[in-house]
Swiss-Prot record:
InterPro entries: UPF0178. It holds the Pfam family DUF188. CDD domains: PIN_YqxD-like. This is UPF0178 protein BSUIS_A1819. Belongs to the UPF0178 family. It comes from the Bacteria. Coiled coil: none annotated.
């Protein structure tokens, strides 16, 4: 991965990411490097350009730790993991969930609190459901959010390497 401070890169929490194909397409269109980080081997299509695979140890948070450590201004982090989103934002990265939700410094506190509340309710047996199934509208929202994040970074002076 290019680690020049003024370049754009995409870091993906890939183990359960449903939008990897979309990330590859957008990255190719913008000529951006992508780093797929996972706890196990994940296949990368041959046609995917500038994609690096990082397989971390089986430790539960190893992928999150790697992504948080490599997050920086100019990085776009794709994750559904709220604590990881918070850590990446602290490092100055842009963060997008696979459903297209854009996390920011001003929204992550409430999102993290809601996540912790739901975890507590689930632990107490009060809530048994989970998030809604991933839908085509989520894929579309993600594509829009990723394009928007890249455009904002370019306007802020970051560039493709």
């Amino acid at each position: 991965m290019e680690n020049e401070p003024d370049t754009i890169c995409i870091l993906v929490d890939a183990d359960a990411c449903p939008v990897k194909a979309e990330i590859y397409r957008v990255a190719e269109r913008h000529n951006l490097p992508v780093v797929i980080v996972a706890n196990s081997f994940i296949a990368i299509p041959r046609e995917a350009q500038r994609v690096e695979r990082v397989v971390v140890s089986g430790n539960l948070d190893a992928a999150d730790d790697w992504i948080a450590e490599h997050s920086r201004p100019g990085a776009v982090v794709v994750t559904a993991d709220i604590p990881l989103a918070s850590r990446a934002l602290e490092k100055g990265a842009s963060v997008i969930a696979p459903n297209g939700r854009i996390h920011t410094q001003s929204t992550i506190g409430n999102t993290l609190a809601a996540r912790n509340l739901m975890d507590s309710l689930r632990s107490a047996g009060e809530v048994t459901g989970g998030p809604a199934p991933f839908a085509p509208k989520d894929r579309s929202a993600f594509l829009s959010a990723l394009d928007l994040a890249i455009v904002r970074l370019k306007r802020a002076g970051f560039h493709a390497s």
